[in-house]
């Protein structure tokens, strides 16, 4: 992934660490480092988002913003490893029953506590066919108890293998042992969502005046096809380590426009997928501002082997 960033935004080192994970989250400022007076970030996000509801999103632009607005049980560190998020610790019994111990100081942006019941509601909502989440199947990857029947409409969402043992203890029961289960929990789809806001505002709960989030940032402004502005969430449990006070996401789809607006000083961070010719040119002209970061991605072929598919039939011996 190719990114261009201005070093003047924050001190060198801190900025590069923030950009590596492609989200403006909290960071430890190295001793002796002097930060710039104005801690704001304007970044291109590649396109207009389809939704800010963690259960309705499926694209990279949406995920970029959701990682700033919402925090799940676990999050990814700078090297892509799962580390504590809302859950400060966790344990399991035979990799089948997992228990997550939530931070007692975790709060929503309105100041109310984030509880285990929030995760029960959120995961049940994710699995519920009525939600029509494109990532409902993600819970199937974790083999949660009863998830297959719930998604198929054979059982109610309340039968999902999740339980709040108390306000700060969330228990998950799987249908079989899954040693890697905790690693799945960095995905945006398993972030908590605010039941009260959803029940009050319905599909409009993600509008700036209605939304409640639990991440390092909260939604300040959303002008469709123009900008989305996030501001620091002072109720976030790790707010003291949040470096950037405001983040503005722009929906610029043209790579050329993206780079031109960066070079004119309108944005601080470009999107990726830069044409090779442009990359080579900029690498020579502004080598200290062009960064190539690892990109975690999986490509695969999915074969349609249904008996009524002509090509599949022709390929059979």
Cite the ranges covered by each PLM segment.
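N-terminal hydrophobic or amphipathic helices and topogenic motifs
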Residues: 25-42, 78-79, 83, 149-155, ...
């Amino acid at each position: 992934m190719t990114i261009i960033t201005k070093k003047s935004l924050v001190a060198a080192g801190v900025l590069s660490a923030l950009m590596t994970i492609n989200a403006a989250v909290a960071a430890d400022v190295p001793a002796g480092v002097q930060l710039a007076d104005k801690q704001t970030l304007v970044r291109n996000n590649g396109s207009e988002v389809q939704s800010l509801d963690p259960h309705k999103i499926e694209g990279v632009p949406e995920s970029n913003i959701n990682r700033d607005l919402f925090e799940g049980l676990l999050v990814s560190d700078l090297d892509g490893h799962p580390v504590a998020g809302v859950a400060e610790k966790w344990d399991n019994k035979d990799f089948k029953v997992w228990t997550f111990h939530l931070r007692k100081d975790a709060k929503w942006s309105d100041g109310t506590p984030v509880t285990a019941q929030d995760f029960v509601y959120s995961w049940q909502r994710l699995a519920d066919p009525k939600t029509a989440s494109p990532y409902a199947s993600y819970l199937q990857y974790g083999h949660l108890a009863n998830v297959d029947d719930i998604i198929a409409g054979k059982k109610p969402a309340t039968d999902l293998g999740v339980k709040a043992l108390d306000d700060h203890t969330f228990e998950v029961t799987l249908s079989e042992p899954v040693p890697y289960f905790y690693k799945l929990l960095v995905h945006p789809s398993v972030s908590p969502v605010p039941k009260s806001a959803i029940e009050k505002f319905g599909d409009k709960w993600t509008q700036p005046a209605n939304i409640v989030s639990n991440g390092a940032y909260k939604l300040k402004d959303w002008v469709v096809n123009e900008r989305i502005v996030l501001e620091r969430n002072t109720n976030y449990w790790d707010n003291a380590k949040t470096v950037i006070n405001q983040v503005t996401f722009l929906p610029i789809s043209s790579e050329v426009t993206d780079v031109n607006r960066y070079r004119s000083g309108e944005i601080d961070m470009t999107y990726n997928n830069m044409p090779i010719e442009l990359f080579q040119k900029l690498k020579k002209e502004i080598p200290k501002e062009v960064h190539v970061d690892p990109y975690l991605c999986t490509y695969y072929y999915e074969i349609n082997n249904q008996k009524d598919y002509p090509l599949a039939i022709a390929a059979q011996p």
